[in-house]
Amino acid sequence: MLKVINLNKSIKNNKNTFKILENINLEVKDGEFISIMGPSGAGKTTLLNIMSTIDRPSEGKVYYDNEDVHSLKNKELSRFRRDNIGFIFQDYNLLDNMSIEDNIALPLVIANEKPDEIQKEVEKLASFFGIKKHLKSYPYELSGGQKQRVAAARAIITSPSIIFADEPTGSLDSKSASELLNCLKEMNKKFNVTIIMVTHDAFTASYSDKIIFIKDGRLNTRIDSNGNRKDFFKQIMNLLTSMGGEVSEFI
């Protein structure tokens, strides 16, 4: 379980201090698929970065199973991140000079796992994400959707308890986005991995179980899916319209 308690984030510019996040309190249960939405500049990615240990809060705590992760020393934090967290970014972050097979395997290679175990895991995940025939290819030979599925396979190969995804469909066309989101949804259920995803897109968010809305650095509201994605999408759109801003701020 992940808990965020009284989290604040500020930045200083000359003599001025700007609040990015203010008094954030949040609890994420194991196995949940949560989206974070909000207007541009609301603090979505900053919150994601703090929860994923990429950034630190100015005040407040982030707990994973009652452990204050931001109190860990550098080596301990690196080990914790390696063992518990996976990342998916909008721009894939694949290594162009490595094959798809090697890109997926990289976290296990770094962890000094046995080669035969690595190969077994790579092939299993490549089949799951529908990219097995591309294992000997290189990133430049794949479409954006295929590259993002490679990134997703790499993110989960270490069996993390939680995956953070920052605008994972932002560079994809609608067909590729749907394919990736179906994979993430199935991955969430099959592997019981928690997913926290930042997105500006209502269609993308409709694949999650719960949506948290941030506005002006504060948690604004939350809605839960009833299990019907089309109904959830309509619910999201209605809420965006009622939040006092233009829908275009979010989409």
Please give the residue ranges for each predicted region.
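Catalytic Walker B motif of ABC-type/P-loop ATPase nucleotide-binding domains
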Residues: 163-166
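Conserved beta-strand-loop-alpha-helix hinge in the C-terminal portion
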Residues: 218-242
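A short, proline-enriched helix->beta-strand linker immediately N-terminal to the Walker B motif
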Residues: 157-161
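Conserved ABC ATPase signature
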Residues: 138-142, 146-148
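Helix-to-loop junction immediately C-terminal to a conserved catalytic motif
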Residues: 52
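Short coil-to-helix segment of the ABC ATPase nucleotide-binding domain corresponding to the Q-loop/switch region
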Residues: 98-105
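Conserved ABC transporter NBD signature motif
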Residues: 60-68
